[in-house]
């Protein structure tokens, strides 16, 4: 009669938890990097839009000169409306 005894001992070290934690940290770091990149791109686009939508120094100077005159012309009223709309 052959009796087979199991001499194997299962030494299951739990490395899955360490791997999972590392993966979660990697994912969080990647999300943070992507978030920073997105915020930087949004800031760049906002600056482009501010520069594009804001009147140049020449227009601003002309508005100041024309609105500071004493005449009550229609041009002055139009210029005042424009300057108010663009936030000067």
UniProtKB/Swiss-Prot annotation:
Protein family according to the UniProt entry: Belongs to the orthopoxvirus OPG197 family.
Residue ranges with Acidic residues bias: 1-19
Name of the protein this chain belongs to: Protein OPG197
Region (Disordered), start-end ranges: 1-22
Top-level division of the source organism's lineage: Viruses
Sequence repeat residue intervals: 2-3, 4-5, 6-7, 8-9, 10-11, 12-13, 14-15, 16-17, 18-19
Segments for region (9 X 2 AA tandem repeats of D-T): 2-19
Alphabetized UniProt keyword annotations: Repeat
Provenance organism: Vaccinia virus (strain Copenhagen) (VACV)
Signals that turn on the gene: Expressed in the early phase of the viral replicative cycle.
InterPro entries found in the cross-reference section: Orthopox_B11R (IPR009754)
């Amino acid at each position: 009669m052959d009796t087979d005894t199991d001499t194997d001992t299962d030494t299951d070290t739990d490395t899955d938890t360490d791997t999972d934690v590392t993966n979660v940290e990697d994912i969080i770091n990647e999300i943070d990097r992507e978030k920073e990149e997105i915020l930087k791109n949004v800031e760049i686009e906002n600056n482009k839009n501010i520069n594009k939508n804001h009147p140049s120094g020449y227009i601003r100077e002309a508005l100041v000169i024309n609105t500071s005159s004493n005449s009550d012309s229609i041009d002055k009223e139009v210029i005042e409306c424009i300057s108010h709309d663009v936030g000067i």
